[in-house]
Amino acid sequence: MSDDERDDWPVQDIVYTSIVGVVMLAAVLEWFLWIAAFLYCLWKVFVKAEHWTIRVLSVVVALLFTALRSIFLPIMVVTLPLPAAVVEVWPPGMVEVLQWFGFWCFAGLLTVPWLFCIYQLVTNQLGRTKRIKQVLDEVSAPKVVIVMPCYKEEPDILVKAVDSVVDCDYPPSCIHVFLSFDGDQEDELYLRTIESLGISLTLESYPKSIDVTYKEARITVSRFPHGGKRHCQKATFELIDKVYRHYLQRNDNLFILFIDSDCILDRHCLQNFVYDMELSPGNRRDMLAMTGVITSTTRKHSLITILQDMEYVHGQLFERTVESGCGSVTCLPGALTMLRFSAFRRMAKYYFADKAEQCDDLFDFAKCHLGEDRWLTHLFMIGAKKRYQIQMCTSAFCKTEAAQTTKSLIKQRRRWFLGFITNEACMLTDWRLWKRYPVLIFVRFMQNTIRTTALLFFIMVLAIITTSKKVDQLPVGFIAVSLGLNWLLMIYFGAKLKRFKVWLYPVMFVVNPFFNWFYMVYGIFTAGQRTWGGPRADAAEASSGATAQEAIEQAEKAGDDLNIVPEMFVRAAAARRRSLNKGNQGGGLGRKTSVVRPPDKIDGRFTARNQLHGGFFTHGDESLDSIAAGGSGEASEPGTRWAPDPRESFDSTLYSQTYGNYGVPPRRLESIMDDEDRKKFELAQQSQSYTILRPARIV
């Protein structure tokens, strides 16, 4: 054979190389952008650091991250099924060493989390089945308050969400729903909702907060001045703190569940949450926070909704379960999170601080607003005194609607990506987390080093399709570990949950890398354009007359939540405080700007109460006299000063001082009715009770 003939490539190699070359360029771009974006975030953390340990960890993490990513690049090149004319150029010894190192690194990074997941699934029950076998009544069941903020929701969807809560297999007298409207207008949504709850529409006006009994459960319907979801939750918390002030003096079995207004709870969701947090055999009653399993639902099936469904199941039941086994989940989503109320109230003033007004730049905005769930979980992880107090409940389920269009999905994933990468940089540079959750943070760091390698599997599939390579010429071990282990889990999840479409996981394994590639590239380029090119001329700005939240809502309404000027948030907030003569309390935290990590003062603060001999529950640093006296920071009349409270630093006193009196007790519905309406309401309540099947609750 002549040299010219040896140099000729087979047709299938030419076709394969022309196709795979494009994919490889995309993979290289993804590899470069991920390392550039992560190093940029570490640099921002270094610049903003409040403590020398942050700077040291920023440098160490950046060096290790760059070194590992640089090693993985040649590993990926020599592992790819390239044509023989290319492969013969690589030195055989180098190829063997790199492939050996790469296989065992990837195998370890994929197998160890898989084993953590298996351990959690063996030791915790998975599925929508009830776990409490004794009879639950209003004495044995802990009280659960459900906070459901609502803003421009469809009335039917909102009522359906409320029904899913009160229809849970849980004593109705132990359920208290706080349905809070973000806006104090008596609009169509408000009126249609209260009508569905049995409230007459014949009244001329309604109190800001009304108590009503619906299907034997207590529902408090409130209207608060518009200020965003977090503001609405904060006002609701103040109301709960006032309503349950005396109850908390002698009880520590009150739990607060945050859900979205479009979430549908599974029938056994509440009792399974409570089982893990309070009622399981041998429970030490020190579980502080839990999230459940959020699955997607859709009105119309399509490729993107099916992919989202598989992503939700895999992300919830694998990734969060692994984190839970390593010591703590790193994201408590606002759509489904339960917390022990007595512990949460010690963190409330930090949790509800107006983080948007503390943003100095887009990095802060992405960290504290786009990724607020992760930032707040970081807060709780520092507040907890030990591991395994912030966990995943694999038997508490709820459904939420998936993104229906490609446009909405891209915007959602851009938010998630920017929130993830900024908070990940902050977590990896917090020495307190390395000390308290070493396994978790190490696993998170190593998983970040192998991100953006999923396109390589598509290249292997392409090699077989084009007959450029045979199966025995491919890295079968790598494929078996990366795809096989995950597919086995998805088959188990699908059978256990009867969601058989998740068995299509190999389709997601091949297709999803392209979606993830686009999400990341789009997110980085649009954020980079905003960071280095500056905002557009029509960007929303905060000012002395417009809050940061109003600027954010203006940008979201215009269709681009990054078209803002966060650099103006701090100055605008300071200008408003000066104009209102309210000082510069910085959202209640005594600082003017955002920080890289939660303050040291919250370290170990997120704890449950202990019971004293007198029957009172207290934290070690609280005054028993103040608890016995019932002091809890009641709202004073407008224009009066608050009396000093020995527990002021722990309770919600700060809110009413700073944000006004939201703690006005709700009025019972009967108190605002005339005699005729009251009789009609009582008849409706009786009829409602008869329509509900009330057998003995063996749960």
From Swiss-Prot:
Polymerizes chitin, a structural polymer of the cell wall and septum, by transferring the sugar moiety of UDP-GlcNAc to the non-reducing end of the growing chitin polymer. Plays a role in cell wall integrity. Required to successfully penetrate the host plants and thus plays a key role in pathogenicity. Gene3D superfamilies: Spore Coat Polysaccharide Biosynthesis Protein SpsA, Chain A. The chain crosses the membrane at residues 19-39, 58-80, 98-118, 445-465, 474-494, 507-527. The keyword Transcription does not apply. GO terms for cellular component: cell septum; plasma membrane. The keyword Membrane applies. Its EC number is 2.4.1.16. It is a multi-pass membrane protein. It is found in: Cell membrane. InterPro entries: Chitin_synth, Nucleotide-diphossugar_trans. It comes from Verticillium dahliae (strain VdLs.17 / ATCC MYA-4575 / FGSC 10137). Pfam families: Chitin_synth_2. Belongs to the chitin synthase family. Class VI subfamily. Disruption phenotype: Leads to a winkled surface morphology. Impairs penetration in host plants and exhibits a significant reduced pathogenicity in Arabidopsis and cotton plants. Keywords: Cell membrane, Glycosyltransferase, Membrane, Transferase, Transmembrane, Transmembrane helix, Virulence. This is Chitin synthase 7. Residues 628-648 are annotated as: Disordered. One of its GO terms (molecular function) is chitin synthase activity.
